[in-house]
Design a protein with these regions (language model features):
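Non-catalytic cap/lid and distal C-terminal segments of serine-dependent acyl enzymes
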Residues: 1-255
């Protein structure tokens, strides 16, 4: 948030206000700086009096890798370490209704994983350029790369989980978790965004969208013609996500 010029520093910094928070996740080969360098997220956050937290997660897929080096538990790190740390350091709200999560690509996958496994922590989630898939359809050599359990990246995740059956029954199987929670009303509000030229993701997202209709899960869909897996799309999508979250407060300074 940006201090309005009409307020003194003491009035602003000692107001006791607790701000809303967006937990914003990067994609593969990215880091905490991606969103600031490649979009206007700082301006969008300032306009809405929003605190944005952008952690670095390497290429972890936001998973716990207990056998990697000294152990790299990124799934637990966000909710068990980083969130309490930020709540203690910064003037932000820890209430569910004031916390949102979003991410792109690998970060979109992380977003839906955190949202459905910790539905008590987030009011809403925006999944950009990522799509849940039905793990029960996984098979070696599946023409759908996201369902090919022999794909090196997927295989590494399967082995990390302790085998295919363990992987299918883990927190990674967001499709199954959504099926379980959809009738309960406990899920955060969900948004999915994708460009029509982001071929693999878009096709899987269309399958998931049909499934949502079948199970009666109401989601917000942001689909843009002609866009691929690219930052121009994600800059547009995050603006739509902030509107979807209901962050309409106008704050800061217009110049």
């Amino acid at each position: 948030p940006d201090k309005p010029r009409a307020l003194t520093p003491e009035e602003f910094y000692r107001s006791g206000r607790k701000y809303k928070v967006l937990w914003l996740l990067h994609g593969t080969f990215g880091d905490h700086s991606d969103w600031v360098r490649k979009t206007n997220i700082e301006m969008y956050a300032t306009e809405r009096n929003l605190v944005v937290v952008m952690p670095s997660a390497l290429n972890s897929s936001y998973a716990n890798w207990d056998k990697f080096m000294m152990g790299f538990g990124m799934f637990d790190y966000l909710t068990e370490e980083l969130m309490p740390l930020i709540y203690g350091w910064l003037p932000v709200s820890d209430k569910r209704e004031d916390n949102y999560i979003a991410g792109l690509s690998m970060g979109g996958r992380g977003t839906i994983k955190f949202a459905v496994n910790h539905p008590d922590k987030f009011a809403a989630a925006a999944v950009l350029s990522a799509a849940p898939v039905d793990f029960s359809l996984m098979s070696p050599g599946n023409p759908n790369m996201m369902l090919d359990c022999a794909n090196p990246r997927t295989l590494a995740s399967i082995e990390n989980a302790g085998g295919l059956e363990a992987y299918q029954n883990s927190c990674e199987n967001v499709w199954a978790i959504i099926d379980k929670l959809a009738p309960t009303g406990k899920l955060p509000r969900l948004m999915f965004a994708c460009g029509t030229e982001d071929t693999l993701i878009y096709e899987n997202l269309q399958t998931f969208r049909k499934h949502c209709e079948e199970i009666g899960l109401d989601c917000h869909w942001f689909i843009k013609e002609g866009y691929r897996h690219e930052w121009r799309f994600w800059d547009l999508a995050i603006q739509d996500a902030l509107d979807f979250f209901g962050l309409t407060e106008r704050g800061g300074n217009p110049y």
